[in-house]
Amino acid sequence: VLLATGRRTNAAGAAQVAALLAELDVAAIRTELPPQSMPLMGLLRIVDRDLAVGWPGAVPPEAAAALRARGFVLLEPPAGPELDVGRALNFVTLGPRRILMPDGNPATRAFLEQAGIECRSVPVDELAKAAGAVGCLTGILERCCPGME
């Protein structure tokens, strides 16, 4: 489990989560978020067992290294207004290599589709008023792990 400290999680809180995970025999990989970031999911999205999409140049190096060491490819779409203003990476993974993303991000969508990711999109005008998009409305209920069926 990637466990990040930053504006929302301090070292003491991360230590408590890491201790609980250790009791469950789950390793916590600690990393620190850049100062301008809040949740790790704002920088990094998992789209398949071996594929992640990250904010260009902002994914913490420890997180990127941990993913690559576990066989992940880390895609970084081109930086620009689609990421900053269009919230293109604020998407929801619907299934392996299938996502629901904010409308109006054609370059990012083309980049993701070229990587084999099926993209559906929806308008997020109202969500954007609260500085969010579809990813902000969701929580992960289940994530399958390699070797688990």
Protein language model regions, located:
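Histidine/cysteine-enriched polar flanking segments
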Residues: 1-149
